[in-house]
Amino acid sequence: MTRTKKNPPLRVGVGGPVGSGKTTLLEMLCKAMRDRYDLVAITNDIYTKEDQRLLTISGALPAERIMGVETGGCPHTAIREDASINLEAVDRMLAKFPDADVVFIESGGDNLAATFSPELSDLTIYVIDVAGGEKIPRKGGPGITKSDLLVINKTDLAPYVGASLEIMESDARKMRGERPFVMGSVKSGQGLDQVIAFIERQGMLDV
């Protein structure tokens, strides 16, 4: 392990609209980082634990290291206005795995206005996808403008949906200013190294 156990675990929130690739990103991050870091993951769904099931089936982490939370209502409420259900889930996972280096918290499918409570997440990654249209970055919203890292996913689909990656990149730069963003296709691994490097650097995992 790279990180000393004297440090508290890094909590990384992963948000974005339904179908943007949040669960796939989380799966790929876990598979790429699990040999270097002690990881646990918490997923949010409104009425099911589908994302927990998908992560478990994919072998991202051992089943006991993945916890599903049923929010039973508006998904962004459970990560922002009343994050108690997720804070409790974090506490339960850390009681089982006190040496965890990173706690990944995936929100349920949400809108562009959703953000993570600072009580819940140290770093936030917001995922949008090219299939949603090239206009998405310029629509703004806290997820796009204020997240620590924006991931513009599924760039390989641009030719099929008539989206201009150049326009999306330009708009993302305008909306985010100095805040970083990554363009890629996480399912194929494109851009994944950049996301991991960001987590390690900003989360001081490599200290």
Curated annotation (Swiss-Prot):
What Pfam families does its record include? cobW
> Can you say where in the cell this protein is located?
Cytoplasm
Q: Which InterPro entries match?
A: CobW/HypB/UreG_nucleotide-bd, P-loop_NTPase, UreG
Task: Decide whether keyword Cytoplasm is in the record.
Answer: yes
The record's comment on protein family reads: Belongs to the SIMIBI class G3E GTPase family. UreG subfamily.
Assembly and oligomerization? Homodimer. UreD, UreF and UreG form a complex that acts as a GTP-hydrolysis-dependent molecular chaperone, activating the urease apoprotein by helping to assemble the nickel containing metallocenter of UreC. The UreE protein probably delivers the nickel.
**Protein name per UniProt:** Urease accessory protein UreG
Species source reads Cupriavidus metallidurans (strain ATCC 43123 / DSM 2839 / NBRC 102507 / CH34)
